[in-house]
């Protein structure tokens, strides 16, 4: 499993995820909980998992060294992404 121990934040990515109704705290919760990882575009990672309230989110992360990632985007998970998560994690929410 890929370990996401540190997320990098700046004004741009905070404003960008706010457009999707997501907070940095929610992204941090996703990366601390039971998540799955998919390869994304340009070597980025798509992290799918629940926030603290159980809402399924997708965080797009760009690797920046060992276990550190720049948050490119975050948004609510699509129905398909929620199904993939449930299948890999054994059912249940999100």
Segment roles from a protein language model:
Residues 1-94:
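Ribonuclease/tRNase effector modules and their secretory precursors
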């Amino acid at each position: 499993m890929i370990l996401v121990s540190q997320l990098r934040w700046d004004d741009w990515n905070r404003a960008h995820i706010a457009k999707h109704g997501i907070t940095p705290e929610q992204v941090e919760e996703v990366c601390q909980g039971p998540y799955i990882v998919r390869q994304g575009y340009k070597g980025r990672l798509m992290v799918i998992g629940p926030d603290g309230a159980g809402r399924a989110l997708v965080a797009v992360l760009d690797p920046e060294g060992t276990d550190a990632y720049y948050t490119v985007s975050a948004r609510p998970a699509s129905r398909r992404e929620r199904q993939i998560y449930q299948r890999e994690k054994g059912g249940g929410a999100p």
